[in-house]
Swiss-Prot record:
Protein's name in the database: Glycerol-3-phosphate acyltransferase
E.C. number: 2.3.1.15
Gene coding for it: plsB
NCBIfam families tied to this protein: plsB (TIGR03703), PRK04974.1 (NF003441)
Naturally occurring in which organism (per UniProt): Shewanella putrefaciens (strain CN-32 / ATCC BAA-453)
Keywords: Acyltransferase, Cell inner membrane, Cell membrane, Lipid biosynthesis, Lipid metabolism, Membrane, Phospholipid biosynthesis, Phospholipid metabolism, Transferase
GO biological process, one term: CDP-diacylglycerol biosynthetic process
Amino acid sequence: MPKQDSLWLKSLRWIQKHLVHTIVVPQDPFADLNLDTSRPLAYVMKTESLSDIAALSEVTEKLGLPSPYEPLVVNGVVAPRVVCLQGRKPLFGERAGNEPFLECFMRLLAVHKERPELDIQLVPVSLYWGRTPGKEDDTMKAAVLERENPTWLRKCFMILFLGRHNFVQFSNAVSLRYMADEHGTDMGIAHKLARVARVHFRRQRKVMTGPLLPNRQALFDSLLKSESLRKAIQEEAVSKKISETQARETAIEYLDEIAANYSDSLVRIAERFLTWLWNKLYSGINIKGAEHIRQLHHDGHEIVYVPCHRSHMDYLLLSYILYYQGMVPPHIAAGINLNFWPAGPLFRRGGAFFIRRSFNGNKLYTAVFREYLDQLFAKGYSVEYFSEGGRSRTGRLLAPKTGMIAMTMNSVLRGIERPVTLVPVYLGYDHVMEVATYHKELSGKKKQKESVWQVFGAIRKLGNFGQGYVNFGEPITLQTFLNEMAPNWRAELADDPEQKPTWLTPAVNVLANRVMTRINDAAAASSVTLTSLALLASEQNALERCLLERQLDLYLTLLKRVPYTSFTSVAEGDGKHLVQQGINLNKFSVSSDPLGEIVSIDANQAISMTYYRNNIIHLFIIPSLIASCLTHNEQSQRQQIVAIVNDFYPLLKAELFMGIKDIPSYVNQVLDLFIEQGLITESDNLSVVTEHSSQLVLLSGSVSETLQRYAIIFNLLAHRPKMERSELESESHLLAQRLGALHGITAPEFYDKKLYGTLSVKLKELGYLSDKDDKSDVKRIRDQANSLLRASVRQTIVASVTAEHIS
């Protein structure tokens, strides 16, 4: 290798500095890969390349890692800092063999044999000039730009045309000490290291670039030849009394309507536009858990991303983040309402495939869509769909639509060999630009049809949107899930492949709810969501600034000391910092008087801010319920509080997709924290410390509207034990409207008919909606709910339930 200060390398680095823009994956190798700067480090690369090493040199200089030009000196042995599996490929002839690689490894292993305390880190490094996957029908462009092992001449073209899309990817370090101790130091282990490294680089490349892209027409032809689609076309011809040719043409029309037309060129252009857009809109995008998903890709999993749906921005944000995290943007199931010009064709070339809101019993469309989805899985493309089916208008997760999850499950049952893994993704924003529109729709205004004019209108409103949040939740591998739900599923399907197992529909429902629960498990508690939670729990949506900051400090401590899950993320900084962030985003107002500053939510913004509160209310609903128990009773006992939480938790779980496995343990951890923070004391009983009671009262306010809903339901059930489900839903909704009008409740979800439907289903499942004469459980929970309400609210509910027009 030429010396770092040679004229040739200086010239090469000058050229690259002006032609090359490098993106590092992961962005923080020290945090994500646990690199230890105190131990010697060497880089392993697939192919020797002066331009690759020059690009790596720029990156290592910025990261504070050893330069690839500096030799590795250990125990008097001098070795290259970069070890390459194969030599450079000349313009003509064969490349050099891997003898230098083996020789270098043997020297390093020999040093480990001599010095037991030595542990050199081998860090695999992959470089990509562009991320073009190539096509199944290779083109001239691919011949010039897309080869995995280019000559120096082709490499020049790649730097010229793709230099602005250079990616340097670091992988987890391999301990040479471990290799030497476990496998020895002979030539055999050196050969094994070479084989493992080659497999690693091959897999890594597929993760970064994705599988080969099909020719769209060739894809259609192969799909139309599939047995299931041929059968569906024949059935369509018979049922519609048309020729098979006409039915086939209809199937082609459906394919053309559905199928993506992925273009890596458009993705590169979109990357530049989105980089500009995110920099304009957001002060930062916070990401958690990407490294684990990258490893799943590397291990050969078929990945299906299942994010929550807050905004049309979701489509763009997740694809952009995955691209910059060294993964291929997925094929996204988008609603057919987004297939309008010019967005539709652009989305399609960005990987979107379109799905109708309802299949309406159209068997041919169903067969075409299912076959297309199977093909995506079979070819190894990652897929993304929104299990909620649409954007949440309230900020809470919607009940899942199970259609896409059922199709994914069926694809596994039809024999996909690779593990298929669902990845729940929490997407959060400090500002959702559609929130005002959502509340108009909730108040009865008709939803506007998506159009190009809406796009222009949205662009005009672009401004300071704060930060975005992308948290990857705990993955669910479907084969493992099926083993849990139906241990003999493989044998059952082998006996009768055409059968629909009786356990399938219940399993799909369990899976859909598990996905939603794991999305909420990965929630992001941000400055806007936390401050909204605190202010909306106060009587006038206003607090003294010092009290608000103190309350937020309590919330931060609670989330960090008693974490909801390990996948949840919590805002950095203290309460003072969070309040200032919210004020800077113009989410909250500040007024001053001689006694100090007051932070408040404007009356016309209060409904909008419930959206952000609802994003994270599940994180605080049980601590809030515990605080309510403490503040409504002069003295409480742990067992009593645990019993109350246990009674309400099944409803909270159904409503908020919660997944706390051990309620008694969680409740006791929260109580222990309250004691530690000086909010309560414990001798024989638990008592609130008077000077800190305001903090617990404020915390308890977050559960008040939920308890009011439960009080409505259980008062109705206790008063009319034989009530039908439909009656309970309609009368609960009617009573909620009355309560809201009398007590100024404005939160949209309080009046959501679907929510009362969800609760009634759970009540029936729990046995509270039944013909049994014994209603002691219903009355106990009614009394518990009533005891945790303000007297005026309790009086309204009890009086309304017993009133003649209700009874």
